[in-house]
Amino acid sequence: MSARVCKTHRVYVGRDVRNFMDIPDLIEIQLRSYDTFLHGARNTPSGADTLISGTREELGLEDVFKTTFPIESSTGDMTLEYQSYSLDEKNIKFSEAECKQKGLTYAIPLKALVDLRFNNTGEIRRKDIYMGDIPKMTERGTFIINGAERVVVSQIHRSPGVVFSHEKDKEGREVFSSRIIPYRGSWLEFEIDQKKDLIYAKLDKKRRILGTVFLRALHYETREQIIEAFYAIEKTPVCQDRAEYELLTGKILARSVTVENEQGETRVLYKAGEKIHPHVIDDLLQNGICEVYIINLEAEGSLRSAVVINCLEREEMKFSKSGAQDELSREEALCIVYSALRPSDPMTMDAAEKDLQTMFFSPRRYDLGRVGRYKLNKKFRSDSPTTECTLTLDDIVNTMKFLIRMYSGDAQEDDIDHLGNRRIRSVGELMTNTLKTAFLRMERIAKERMSSKETETIKPQDLISIKPIMAAIKEFFGASQLSQFMDQVNPLAELTHKRRLNALGPGGLSRERAGFEVRDVHYTHYGRMCPIETPEGPNIGLIVSMANYARVNGYGFLEVPYVRVRDGVVTKEIEYLDAMDEDRYYIGQDSTAVGPDGVIRVDHVSCRHRGDYSTRSPKDIQYMDVSPKQIISVSASLIPFLEHDDANRALMGSNMQRQGVPLIFPEPPRVGTGMEEKCAYDSGVLVKAKQDGTVAYVSSEKIVVCSAAASGEEQEVVYPLLKYQRTNQDTCYHQRPIVHVGDRVQVGDALADGPATYRGELALGRNILVGFVPWNGYNYEDAILISHRVVKEDMFTSVHIKEFSTEVRETKLGSERMTNDIPNKSEKNLDNLDAEGIIRIGSKVRAGDVLIGKITPKSESETTPEFRLLNSIFGEKAKEVRDSSLRVPHGVEGTVIDVQRLRRSEGDDLNPGVSEVVKVLIATKRKLREGDKMAGRHGNKGIVARILPEEDMPYLDDGTPLDVCLNPLGVPSRMNIGQILESELGLAGLRLDEWYESPVFQSPSNEQIGEKLMQAGFPTNSKVMLRDGRTGDYFQNPVFVGVIYFMKLAHLVDDKMHARSTGPYSLVTQQPLGGKAQFGGQRLGEMEVWALEAYGAANTLQELLTIKSDDMHGRSKIYEAIVKGEASSPTGIPESFNVLVQELRGLALDFTIYDAKGKQIPLTERDEEMTNKIGSKF
């Protein structure tokens, strides 16, 4: 028997649409990116321990080493050369489980083989150097940093390359500009001044320079060279023929016309770039010139605008010496460029040359990156090698040409929100950038050490400091905006977090600066980014999710698969296209009728081309979508009937599924979409078989599978199961076996369920019987009325695990001790503690109970002879100690399920001054109760308002009571009709005992749902007569009844409810603190004061503003009065008033208060002293 038998059998209901491809691995973006970072593009078999430099493509770590090395000393006598690196898989110190328990980082040692070469003698000293620990990614695509699971979110940012834009400035003038954006280095911008018809260059956002002046600084030294770079040139005869004469008039000379005088000297008659007028032709003929070279503005490849010629004229007017015929020299052009870059610095020719050279043409200062080069090649259809990562003169000329073409209407501007201009930086690339910066610091230190160490004794390991590397890694994983605490509420939350794309973070956008356009849905998002799943707050549109089939290519651009169509026939070829390639094709919809032979059976196909939607003949389309669900993300594709929901509610539905708490008894949805299995499988919470075999042993703690080894003998593979583990969000991570002894399993089969999964499918909630009927106002405004049966049968009961820890420290007065002998505590309070003062596993605890008894030495006052006598008699006990026990905080109760101890004496790495850390895990069983938030998959959320006895709930004619009553007014205005269709199909499934698969955009029609309802014996509109549970009478009208999949969300009332009688006060204002975390009070704000004033409740108001808040004197007096049973004394002055007085005194305003009798009221101790002094004088 195969383990596959355990799976829920689903009946497909919906339109017959062909899916050409299965969904790829959903966390591939994380795994592949980090694997490339660690190993490069591997050419050797996986698992090879060391790879010799040269067998890896220069990506990731290899790129980091190659960029930094060789490191040469300042004198040039020694060089550090890198040979290869290795990852020491065998020496990983701790396993994933140990790292989580001990609060460590799961990492792998990195070693580099480095040569120290002495250039004078040729001697080489080689050493394999430890370069620090690199965090290792788990199989689930996460990192364990300081014991907590973290995810590095991929960043979407503006791609390096060239961008052409056309916008209006503040004065309303049109500005045509282009920017060459490198991966690292200075920006180069060009803009056209429409008023003057000139092109300017801007280097690093400094003062603008005339375009031709910049070109002259880049070795385009003559007018002829500049003109040839931009225009087509042709030779033309000069003659007196009238027709030829007129044709030549108005043309522009491409080359200067020179003549020789009688002495044999050559002089320029007309410069290149000058316009030919009739008198010029006469002059040429008189000087015996028969042919000239002119610019052909209409020729192919030539610019049609004379912008460059205008620049040459402007340059001559502005810079040529009076009366001189000479052109601007390169040296003069360099001076102009340098003065624009560094206006205050003294100018030297060498400095100007070097500055410009390093700015754009030095690999150390300027890097286009592989992506930038790829983008430039694609834009200008050039074939520069991808290794050419600096700018070339051709790049600069091509940029200027394209900008001028755009200005003259021959080229289109770029759309900066197009996904061809935005790319993904995944974890591998982010780590590469972090390490490059760290290695630069290491290089500086190595150079300093080279000049200070003795040559005879120096070794490679003496020169390399790994501190900057370790610090950078720690800072990146611990503090970077993109390294996030993993959202671990349920498997879907984990999966979605790993597929998230973030436009924020270093080098990205900021919430404040991001406008509407960058947040909006763009046509290139189709199949790449989900148009639905995004947060609702200020991050809307900036944090998005990858679509189901999308992948990131080698350049970081999102690609989407399409099936190839040739002559109206759909082939089996799958091709991935990025956004730039896709713009060239017509792409048909997947809903098109296609025969088994691949022939498209309709005359007109709905298709897309760029942002336009139209219908075309099947022969006109080149590609077709591979699946209807390729445009949305994982969360959205779990919502059945998604196409019937309003976009806002679909967004809420997909976001709220991630908040569903794993239940003790989960159930997969009766109406699913077929994505449940894939989602659970790729999330990493299931235990999967690593090889074929037979299940030999099953228990709650492990599964043993016997499989045939290569030698022919049977070998046992043990799969341990995780039990009651705490997640990042305090939910319970628990695995249960789903196979039985004797089952045959294949590689990849699910052996055990994880949290929120059932039989290998995602199960975030429960299917419950719902009626859309008002009930005494208890389901007003989205409130939910629920049956006690749901609570009684633990349908929505979940387990939550909290961790509390304490440290045993060495103090200056002696060490802290754990003990069950705590001063001033009765034996009854300490019953559950063992001999060492630690709570016993299995104990039930409530708020205030001691978990770990601990005492701390107090500072000893001057010891009297009596105290010394007592100390000598009773020893330690008489010493003054303070109770510093770990107690259960307010609002927490549960059962102690585990106690973990980390001791320095046993080799655990603890903080300085800490000898032991003890962690206590408390599990709480949370039943559904009033105030808990619940939601369906269609954005239909609400709060449980009342739990009604089962017998009072409305019931069907056969006696079945409803589980939930929802308000019917919650549907029309929200326009989430998907919940209505889901409940109809779910009701039929309940009666027929069927589980349905209805994929997104392939949903069944009303007729198909009606057929199922008829089979089940229900009316086709799903409306039935309900009886009132209290009276047994029918309701006046038929009620819509169905089965909806509901989830309990992580917003539980137990975590939010809070009350305070006594508690801490603020040190300055003496008012109670705020918030549950600080055990604060309720704030009486302005509006609450107004309300009490309106009712004239003067005494209540005075009490709330004084003794119940910050009247310190009044507080103690009222306590005394209550204890003694006396009448309450009058209130004093609130402390916040004293604070105000002190602030006014700080402004040098003398402020004194007097009572009704004219006597001064002291506000501070100093005031009191002054008053007493004055009183004593009189």
From Swiss-Prot:
A Pfam family reported for this protein in Swiss-Prot or TrEMBL: RNA_pol_Rpb2_3
Entry keywords, A to Z: DNA-directed RNA polymerase, Nucleotidyltransferase, Transcription, Transferase
Cross-referenced InterPro entries: DNA-dir_RNA_pol_bsu_external_1 (IPR019462), DNA-dir_RNA_pol_su2 (IPR015712), DNA-dir_RNAP_su2_dom (IPR007120), DNA-dir_RNAP_su2_hyb_sf (IPR037033), RNA_pol_bsu_bac (IPR010243), RNA_pol_bsu_CS (IPR007121), RNA_pol_bsu_protrusion (IPR007644), RNA_pol_Rpb2_2 (IPR007642)
Record keyword Magnesium present: no
Protein's UniProt keywords contain Transmembrane: no
Assigned EC number: 2.7.7.6
CC terms in the record's Gene Ontology section: DNA-directed RNA polymerase complex
Catalytic activity: RNA(n) + a ribonucleoside 5'-triphosphate = RNA(n+1) + diphosphate
PROSITE patterns: RNA_POL_BETA (PS01166)
GO MF annotations in UniProt: DNA binding; DNA-directed RNA polymerase activity; ribonucleoside binding
A Gene Ontology biological process term: DNA-templated transcription
Entry similarity comment: Belongs to the RNA polymerase beta chain family.
Quaternary state and interactors: The RNAP catalytic core consists of 2 alpha, 1 beta, 1 beta' and 1 omega subunit. When a sigma factor is associated with the core the holoenzyme is formed, which can initiate transcription.
Functional description taken from the UniProt entry: DNA-dependent RNA polymerase catalyzes the transcription of DNA into RNA using the four ribonucleoside triphosphates as substrates.
Protein name as catalogued: DNA-directed RNA polymerase subunit beta
